[in-house]
Amino acid sequence: MKKKKENISKTKKNESNGENNNHFQLPIICNADSLRTLIRKKTVRVVDVRKAEDYQQEHVPTAVSLPFGDLLEKDTPVGIIDILRDLGIVDKMPVVIYDDTFGALAARVAWTFQYVGHTNTALLQMTFSHWKNQGLETEKKINTFPKSQHSLNVNHNIHADASYVENAKEHPDKILVDARERLNFLTEHIPGAKNIPYTMIGSNGNILRNAEEVKRFIENRGISTDSEIITYCGSVGTLSGLAYYALKLAGVKNVKLYSKSFREWKSLGKPKEEFKDANYWDLSAE
């Protein structure tokens, strides 16, 4: 995905359910000012992935509701395309996603949209609570849009399954990254994985640190931005989804998400590694 410094570049025109036709390529992270501008111009679909009852209380203006649990229930390529169509999202339409869970749910949804071919997807730089605490606009209107058409173009290059992960250990240039908290990682993890706790990649109300900070952080872990990196977490790819976008933001070109993560790995009886004699310093993520 082409990244620019909060610079949203115009690409082309297309249909967008009666809204402004100008489509723009979004950066990985969309800040509040940029999103407010896009909302005013009616050139974006905002997606709220919190629980339905939270959305009904209030939300970012024009946002549609996609509770994260609903996405998991339809988590196949065809099912996700149906969701995009139901939300009135067409190919190339700019989509900005937010949550109230430090960006983890939004990241998993954004990655899923990209996996089925909707590449013009960004994460809101902040959570909804932070948006509200800054005094930014909210509304209670339940937003719906006419059902759209959307093509299916699965991007296998950003996904890893258990077999791929298992074979990765034979390739030194492929690095596994466990995004869980340090103690969970030390208790047990996929052999050879490095730990980048999700708690270390956000900062100052933002769901992700800036690109240079993330790059420095991963390099301190002995991870090269030239490597192929596979992220995973404990269950359904939320924490590792956030790590996925942190790595992309830092300039890592080849990142994959093992979306079924450690829960599937254990259920398949795959090998695990642990630190039986971990001490206080082992718990430090720095």
List the predicted regions and their residue ranges.
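A short, acidic, amphipathic alpha-helical segment used as a generic capping/interface helix at domain edges
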Residues: 210-223
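Short, glycine/charged-enriched secondary-structure capping and boundary segments
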Residues: 59-62, 110-112, 137, 189-192, ...
